[in-house]
């Protein structure tokens, strides 16, 4: 049964990447004491060792024997199995089991072998195969080992099972009771494991299980071949643990030789659970969640088959160290071919075409022999490799020693050779006359060389032009001597890339041009006595004729069939090497005086072309012909000649010249610019201030200095403002501040003592000293300040009294207000009709005024106050008053609120305080006049006498206004039959806020509703007027249609109505 579980595991994991199961033969053997089954090292995926299927099954069986207690107690042969006689009894199994095949399963992994993850205690304990196997905690990282992975494509990073046959000869040579040893420490399963499995089963299924083991080993593998999609190893799916257990149990139950029963079902469950637990331990299964990783297999967790990931081969973001292969300049031509090219060039230069062909054939044969020798050495090294790591090292060494293939040129940049339309891949030359008849020779078409002129120009890498042998053969059918390049020899050393150029051979006679190329252009004249080709890389061309030109170097005289030779640079005298600026035809004019500018737009005509020297003309003609392509014939002298330059346009500025004038001096005087000499301001010498004496403390000095700097006036003007009571120069606020900061007697004494010395006082001390010198300064300032305060206080008190007086008078005498109250009385009696307590009223108390808005009608937006306002407006409309002329019948809400805030007792106290201050000011004025000298007495005396006279009248008027306002307020309360809430108070004791509190809300609500009603009435009248106009226009149009005659006025009205 355990064997069957192992086969199912091979089937599941083999579905992803593995070989099919193949039967084999085996020899019986007993498991030694050194078996690694105890610590599970043999079955770890990261160890990459081979495991026999029987060994795997015996491990599962041994683990099951100690798991289910119910089954163990019912097994009578348990003591024999677990005792010392277990191995002896195992050797006496049925001889039919000896024919059972031994299947070796190996965990294939791409990882390098790691060190053993088991502890030393586990390796010292010697256990029997049949002893209970406890499950140690899984070693750290057994599912995802951290060993560095190889980056070769030869190794595959998958965990799979590979089934192999064990050799029958090796197994038969071992004694029956001894375990064979192999290089890979493979343990062969013996019939002992099968007998142990039978011994652990219940008696009723022991025979069937033994027979099933024989049949399963010798015959064909039975069982269901169906694997669920999520359990497939190649599907990379996540599945629940119970799904795997159910599938394993179903495969065991599907076996026709397995008996059914409750005990058997429990054994199946235990065996499948232990089987999955071992799979998790060895690393085949990987738990997804990180919780309970140290526990065993759980059917309620999510699992996944362990797959090792493919190593990433992403290139580094920053360039690393360049190796020899990527050394600059890059060349994809093997050194063997370069040697052949050099040999062919030398032979062509010395002995002609025939000698070069013989040299190329000899070199090609030597290169082929060298390549075969290298291939034989490589085969021997590969055969001597015993592990995949060694094979991988050999392959890497081979790959690193071979040049990389030619890179594809980038589309974003072009080589300089392509821009110049020249290359060294194919070397040939046209004769200018075409008279000689020689066969044109080509170099090897597949020789890829670097363009020397492209170095440092194209940054995306060097590229070469690759031409196949077939294309070369089509282009030149007369080349029987062209030899194909031999296979590439081993990579040359680094010094081969920078070999010195060979000595140039004498140039051969130029061959005639091919028929399909037309007339070739004449080549540029080479320097005398020069060689034939630039130094390699690339190698020198076969044909001569071109020399090494001086810098800037032109291209070789033998361009490719798809390029042309570049023209040499023009003569520097022509100005084509550098951009020639447009020079002026006229010389600069320097007037004797600076003139006024004339802002015009200058036109500069080009200078006439200078005649060209004959030598320059000849060289230019030769360069023009040399720049053509070898595929194109030279331009003819007739119709193919380039068109001449168009004649210059005729302009007035090229025909006229400046006229000499006789009155240029007069012009200079008239239009010269007058230069104004800058006048420098005289520098004011700042007198450094001497040290000053500070008497005050720093805080006091700072406060006095702030007030002094805010005045911005000298002390003399301050003195004048105080003597003349002039607040236009010094503000009243500044005078108040000066009155507050006056020096005390102590400070003033210290300041006077410091002022007698040579060192001046500081500004704050000097300011206090100047104020103290003013006669009666503080008394004068107090009188001036009180004069301003008195006028302000009297004005405020008069306004309060006038507000209450005017409001009381309006409430008594307003006819509009009386109409409103009559409407309220009428509607109230109508609403209270039939009620003996509230009906038939002659008046109402003022507390109802604030409740009118709360009386709702059937319409939610209409209240009793709304109806009262509409009724008042309708009454005024009946009298013929226009809606815009209807006045608000009630007092202004703002006046009512101000009147409610006034208190007669408070006003009377304010008048009393003001009168007291006024009396003090009188005494101060008399004191100042008594202490002042006659010259400083005026105008202070006259102004203060005038103020005192006016203040006496104002105080008497205030007392009178207060009494009149109080009497009028009492009359108003009696007029409206007002009674205070507190019955103990009389009308004389009532305050304005108690009376006007009923009017405040009423006036605010009445005014808001009155504004809305007036606006609504005006809109309604506007609609009616527009409707009337429309009706009148319609009537006019009907009358015109009836009469048949339309006047001009009627036409205008019709047009307006239509618009």
UniProtKB/Swiss-Prot annotation:
Changing residue 1051 to A/D: Abolishes interaction with spir. It is a peripheral membrane protein. Its main location: cytoplasm. SUPFAM superfamilies: Formin homology 2 domain (FH2 domain) (SSF101447). GO terms for cellular component: actin filament; cell cortex; cytoplasm; cytoplasmic vesicle membrane; cytosol. It comes from the Eukaryota. GO terms for biological process: actin cytoskeleton organization; actin filament organization; actin filament-based process; actin nucleation; chorion-containing eggshell formation; oogenesis; pole plasm assembly; pole plasm oskar mRNA localization. Residues 480-560 form the FH1 domain. Keywords: Actin-binding, Cytoplasm, Cytoplasmic vesicle, Cytoskeleton, Developmental protein, Membrane, Protein transport, Stress response, Transport. The keyword Cell cycle does not apply. It holds the Pfam family FH2. Residues 585-1032 form the FH2 domain. Acts as an actin nucleation factor and promotes assembly of actin filaments together with spir. May play a role in intracellular vesicle transport along actin fibers, providing a novel link between actin cytoskeleton dynamics and intracellular transport. Belongs to the formin homology family. Cappuccino subfamily. PANTHER family: FORMIN HOMOLOGY 2 DOMAIN CONTAINING, ISOFORM I, FORMIN-G. This is Protein cappuccino. It comes from Drosophila melanogaster (Fruit fly). The lineage of its organism: Eukaryota, Metazoa, Ecdysozoa, Arthropoda, Hexapoda.
């Amino acid at each position: 049964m355990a064997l069957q579980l192992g086969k199912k595991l091979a089937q599941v994991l083999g579905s992803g990447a593995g070989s099919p199961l193949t039967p084999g033969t085996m020899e019986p053997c007993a498991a030694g004491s050194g078996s690694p089954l105890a610590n599970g090292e043999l079955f770890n995926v990261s160890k990459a060792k081979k495991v026999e299927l029987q060994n795997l099954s015996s491990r599962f069986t041994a683990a099951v024997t100690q798991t289910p207690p119910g089954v163990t107690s019912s097994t009578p042969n348990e003591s024999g199995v677990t005792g010392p006689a277990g191995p002896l009894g195992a050797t006496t199994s049925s001889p039919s089991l000896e024919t059972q095949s031994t299947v070796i399963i190996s965990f294939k992994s791409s990882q390098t072998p790691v060190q053993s993850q088991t502890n030393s205690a586990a390796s010292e304990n010697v256990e029997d195969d049949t002893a209970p196997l406890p499950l140690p905690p899984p070693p750290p990282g057994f599912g995802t080992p951290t060993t560095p992975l190889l980056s070769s494509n030869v190794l595959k990073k998958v965990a799979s099972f590979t089934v192999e046959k064990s050799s029958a000869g090796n197994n038969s040579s071992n004694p029956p009771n001894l375990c064979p040893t192999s290089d890979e420490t493979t343990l062969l399963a013996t019939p002992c494991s099968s007998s142990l499995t039978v011994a652990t089963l219940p008696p009723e299924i022991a025979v069937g299980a033994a027979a099933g083991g024989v049949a399963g080993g010798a015959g064909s593998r039975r069982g269901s071949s169906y694997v669920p999609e999520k359990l497939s190893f190649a599907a990379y799916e996540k599945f629940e643990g119970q799904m795997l257990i159910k599938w394993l149990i179903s495969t065991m139950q599907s076996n026709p030789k397995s008996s059914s029963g409750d005990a058997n079902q429990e054994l199946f469950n235990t065996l499948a659970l232990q089987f999955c637990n071992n799979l998790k331990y060895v690393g085949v299964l990987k738990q997804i969640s990180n919780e309970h990783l140290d526990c065993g297999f759980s059917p309620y967790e999510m699992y996944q088959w362990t797959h090792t990931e493919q190593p990433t081969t992403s290139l580094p973001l920053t360039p690393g160290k360049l190796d020899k292969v990527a050394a600059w300049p890059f060349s994809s031509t093997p050194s063997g071919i370069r040697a052949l090219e050099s040999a062919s060039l030398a032979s062509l230069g010395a002995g002609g075409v025939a000698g070069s062909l013989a040299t190329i054939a000899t070199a090609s044969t030597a290169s082929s022999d060298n390549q075969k020798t290298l291939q034989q050495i490589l085969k021997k090294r590969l055969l001597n490799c015993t592990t995949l790591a060694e094979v991988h090292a050999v392959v890497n060494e081979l790959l690193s020693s071979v040049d990389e293939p030619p890179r594809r040129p980038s589309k974003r940049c072009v080589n300089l050779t392509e821009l110049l339309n020249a290359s060294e891949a194919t070397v040939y030359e046209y004769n200018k006359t075409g008279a000689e008849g020689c066969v044109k020779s080509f170099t090897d078409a597949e020789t890829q060389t670097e363009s020397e002129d492209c170095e440092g120009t194209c940054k995306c890498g060097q590229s070469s032009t690759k031409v196949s042998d077939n294309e070369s053969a089509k282009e030149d059918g007369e080349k029987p001597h062209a030899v194909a390049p031999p296979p590439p020899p081993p990579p040359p050393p680094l010094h081969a890339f920078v070999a010195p150029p060979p000595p140039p051979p004498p140039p051969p006679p130029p061959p005639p041009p091919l028929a399909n190329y037309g007339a070739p252009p004449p080549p540029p004249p080479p320097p005398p006595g020069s060689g034939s080709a630039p130094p390699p890389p690339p190698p020198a061309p076969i044909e001569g004729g071109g020399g090494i030109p001086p810098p800037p170097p032109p291209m070789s005289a033998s361009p490719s069939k798809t390029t042309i030779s570049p023209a040499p640079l023009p003569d520097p005298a022509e100005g084509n090497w550098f951009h020639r600026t447009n020079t002026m035809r006229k010389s600069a004019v320097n007037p004797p005086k600076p003139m006024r500018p004339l802002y015009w737009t200058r036109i500069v005509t080009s200078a006439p072309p200078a005649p060209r020297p004959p030598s320059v003309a000849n060289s230019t003609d030769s360069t023009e012909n040399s720049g053509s392509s070898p595929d194109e014939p030279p331009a003819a002298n007739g119709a193919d000649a380039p068109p001449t330059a168009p004649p210059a346009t005729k302009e007035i500025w090229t025909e006229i010249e400046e006229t000499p004038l006789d009155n240029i001096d007069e012009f200079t005087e008239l239009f010269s610019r007058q230069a104004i000499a800058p006048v420098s301001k005289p520098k004011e010498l700042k007198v450094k201030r001497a040290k000053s004496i500070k008497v005050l403390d720093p805080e006091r000095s700072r406060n006095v200095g702030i007030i002094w700097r805010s005045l911005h006036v000298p002390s003399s003007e301050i003195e004048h403002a105080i003597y003349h009571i002039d607040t236009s120069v010094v503000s009243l606020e500044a005078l108040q501040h000066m009155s507050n900061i006056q020096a005390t007697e102590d400070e003033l004494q210290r300041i006077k003592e410091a002022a007698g010395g040579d060192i001046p006082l500081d500004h704050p001390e000097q300011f206090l000293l100047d104020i103290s010198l003013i006669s009666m300064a503080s008394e004068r300032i107090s009188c001036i300040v009180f004069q301003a305060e008195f006028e302000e206080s009297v004005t405020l008190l008069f306004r309060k009294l006038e507000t209450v007086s005017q409001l009381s008078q309006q409430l008594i005498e307003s006819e509009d207000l009386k109409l409103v109250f009559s409407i309220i009385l009428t509607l109230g009696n109508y609403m209270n009709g039939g009620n003996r307590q509230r009906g038939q009223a002659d008046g109402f108390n003022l507390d109802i005024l604030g409740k009118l808005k709360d009386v709702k009608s059937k319409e939610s937006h209409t209240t009793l106050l709304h109806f009262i306002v509409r009724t008042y407006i309708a009454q005024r409309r009946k009298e013929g008053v226009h809606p815009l002329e209807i006045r608000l019948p009630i007092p202004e809400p703002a006046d009512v609120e101000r009147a409610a805030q006034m208190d007669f007792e408070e006003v009377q106290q304010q008048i009393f305080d003001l009168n007291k201050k006024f009396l003090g000011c009188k005494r101060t004025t008399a004191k100042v006049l008594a202490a002042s000298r006659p010259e400083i007495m005026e105008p202070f005396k006259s102004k203060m006498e005038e103020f005192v006279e006016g203040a006496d009248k104002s105080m008497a008027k205030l007392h009178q206004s207060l009494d009149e306002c109080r009497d009028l307020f009492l009359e108003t309360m009696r007029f409206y039959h007002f009674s205070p809430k507190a019955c103990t108070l009389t009308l004389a004791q009532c305050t304005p806020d108690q009376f006007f509190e009923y009017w405040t809300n009423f006036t605010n609500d009445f005014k808001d509703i009155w504004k809305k009603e007036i606006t609504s009435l005006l809109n309604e009248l506007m609609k009616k007027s527009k409707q009337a106009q429309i009706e009148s226009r319609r009537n006019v149009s009907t009358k015109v249609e009836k009469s048949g005659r339309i006047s001009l006025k009627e036409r205008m009205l019709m047009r307006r109505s239509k618009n």
